[in-house]
């Protein structure tokens, strides 16, 4: 089936099966396994090295405040590139973006494991973040292709459970690894998992059933998006590191200027990179705001708590990880119950 599309700045042609309704068993299970593995790796690596930051700072002989960039570099790249890669997935194919993301993430993990200096480790985390951004950007779209429409809620629920568990399981897994191996193994363990995930995804993930022909990727919007979010994180980091106010003010002014240009460019687009049309829906915008606040609070705790337990209370890396294990354990038990209740109780109450 073919459908023509036209916009103020885009012309294209939609070609493919517009009635696609997911995969059949047993392929659906293998495809979801490949999807969950990549997503789990991407999310858990945002927190897995938090417990090891004091050890990394000590071994590389750098201040604790500088070692935070091992975490920040990863998160910064994801924030800058998530929307551009999501847009690219529509044109290039979700499966292709996902596969390239697995490759970049696995190579980044190898470079992290071999790093002997902080700059090299941070640069390697940038490569990891590039891969994670590619994986995360197309994850939900791949889930929609895998599951039939009547089971899509099940797929999205399982996906959310994987994200929730991976978000808080990092310290526990980190403690288990650090109990028997040095910190480079936190990254080396990703390599075999990444290789297996790549071949599983290449074999079982579906290609885009619908392709857009004739519409080009908007590099200008991608650069503006990356610059806006990059300047935002940069200003926050500059403030936390006591950078002179004039530089911070300059960064804020640049962020606002670039951000205004970016936002204005999105209005009137048929395919905006920043979906303001969705944000106009109250329930959607409220849900997004709630999720952002929840994950922000969670990540702040996950980053700060290891330093509190190690530097203030004197726990080692293993003890710190064990104390933080209660968080993911509760999620493991509560998440399935919440998934069962969501069809019976209003989500707002849950």
Where are these regions (language model features)?
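Central cavity-lining transmembrane alpha-helices of secondary-active solute carriers
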Residues: 72-86, 136-140, 325-338
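Structural signature of transmembrane alpha-helices in multi-pass secondary transporters
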Residues: 35, 42, 71-74, 78, ...
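Hydrophobic/aromatic and small-residue hotspots that mark the transmembrane alpha-helices
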Residues: 53, 85-86, 94, 139, ...
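Extracellular/periplasmic helix-loop-helix junction of adjacent transmembrane segments
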Residues: 52-81, 120-123, 313, 318-323
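Hydrophobic transmembrane-helix bundles of small-molecule transporters
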Residues: 179-290, 294-297
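12-transmembrane solute porter fold
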Residues: 30-37, 44, 49-51, 64, ...
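Helix-loop-helix hairpins in multi-pass membrane proteins, especially solute transporters
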Residues: 87-220, 238, 247
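Cytosolic juxtamembrane N-terminal segment immediately preceding the first transmembrane helix
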Residues: 1-44, 58
